[in-house]
């Protein structure tokens, strides 16, 4: 575990419409029921400043490098003000999206983007990576149907199936590259409770 922290850092990753936020909330409530010190947060966002940056990110069309730097600026504020202090106090921190989402959403738009994002994170941040990441694996066709059935309110929701596939296969690649950290939960045909039970087995 990173010597900057005493707690545990858990992240949830995947594309749109796959149930990440639901699973983050369910794990948070489960750990609370066990009297475990835990906080739930999200990216992009998590602090007052970062949430303001999120509004620009999800509703405005930015140039690729501008979008990446916007995400990194929001993350730095989030980590410094919320994540690191909580970890240092011994809390479990659950975060709905983190560095891997930046790789897949912003990095793919840039040449050598995967390595660029990870290297930028290591340079600007205090080398903090999740202890465990849950990739909620839902097939793109299923995910886009779920998104289309709800109120779409940001630029990522309304993109087509090709975008969903690109993001999906990026997360698949990352899970193959970092199998010790990233745990794949195949969730296309499972209920939220069944997914939650699988996640608990990895804790």
UniProtKB/Swiss-Prot annotation:
Q: Which Pfam families match?
A: Thymidylate_kin (PF02223)
E.C. number, please?
2.7.4.9
Gene3D superfamilies per UniProt: P-loop containing nucleotide triphosphate hydrolases
Indicate whether Cell inner membrane appears among the record's keywords: no
GO MF terms listed in the record are: ATP binding; dTMP kinase activity
Enumerate the Gene Ontology biological process terms. Answer: dTDP biosynthetic process; dTTP biosynthetic process; dUDP biosynthetic process
Q: Which residues bind ATP?
A: 14-21
**One Gene Ontology cellular component annotation?**
cytosol
Q: Which keywords does this chain's UniProt record carry?
A: ATP-binding, Kinase, Nucleotide biosynthesis, Nucleotide-binding, Transferase
Key word Nucleotide-binding present? yes
Reaction(s) the record says it catalyses: dTMP + ATP = dTDP + ADP
- Report the sequence similarity comment from the record: Belongs to the thymidylate kinase family.
Function in brief: Phosphorylation of dTMP to form dTDP in both de novo and salvage pathways of dTTP synthesis.
Name of the protein described by the UniProt record:
Thymidylate kinase
Q: What organism does this protein naturally occur in?
A: Rickettsia africae (strain ESF-5)
